[in-house]
């Protein structure tokens, strides 16, 4: 039953909180940016799967996991509201966060169902690249069969205008047959959130 499955997946993630790397508590701060929101639903995919819902769900779980590990976290939105790009950047710059992580889901032109995959963008610098590589690697681990579209430089406003290492993760295609089937499931969203949290913590361990 769905209820039992839900319980099993909760147990699954509780066990796994202990599997996340430990870092010095109360030292690091992160801004998590769920893409889109409100009347801006972002990409709309198979069976009406909306990017905004998927990424908000994943972002909330990432936030919860990081808080458990003693990281200070701010979200640019924590409900279905529309937020312009400038205030997202302003929040990160004003709070002087260590890193900025924007979470999105992809769509292919013409909604081609055979296009799936994971990609993570950074704007510049070795720290941005390292953060993107750590997150990309972990998301791929929980998305078997979904192509590795790589870590690339991107000129997105939110990662270009932020003053700290910043990345934009595309966690799969809502228009892709393989990715969409996963992204609509709670358990997969949890796994992706766990992967992103792990990538972030691995990054902090590495840069100190």
Give the location of each predicted region.
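Catalytic-site microenvironment of enzymes
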Residues: 1-208
